Amino acid sequence: MTIRQDKGEIGEKEVCELVGCPNCGKKLIQLPKGFPLYDVQCSGCMFRAQVKTPMNFNGKNVSGAGWNILDKALKVGMIIPPLIVNSKDEVRFYPYIPKTAFKRRIATIKQKNGNEPRLHPMFDYDLEELKYYVLLKK
């Protein structure tokens, strides 16, 4: 795992502790590492979401994830997962992410174990124009 993935793991746990499901209010639980597309799900209903924990959130952009898995999911007709952004100031919920909000890029991934960095197709979220709900003010 990379350092960013470790921080994301901590952010997912924090979301599960601090906020309830945006749909029904019940407890959110973390999905297993490596679960495709989603990070948390509701313990009571079928709600699932992607969680991002940006270090410096400006309200506009958030680093996404690997492009390849999302691209394959979209090609088979899956919907884009809702997004929960866990920043220093608040927890935001973006229920609908259009395809136009994705900005593709090639990332250099630094390995935690010191191995050579690798190039990986990624995407970022452009959230500037998207509607959101504040789930929690910190």
At which residue positions do the language-model features occur?
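Nucleic-acid endonuclease domains
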Residues: 1-138
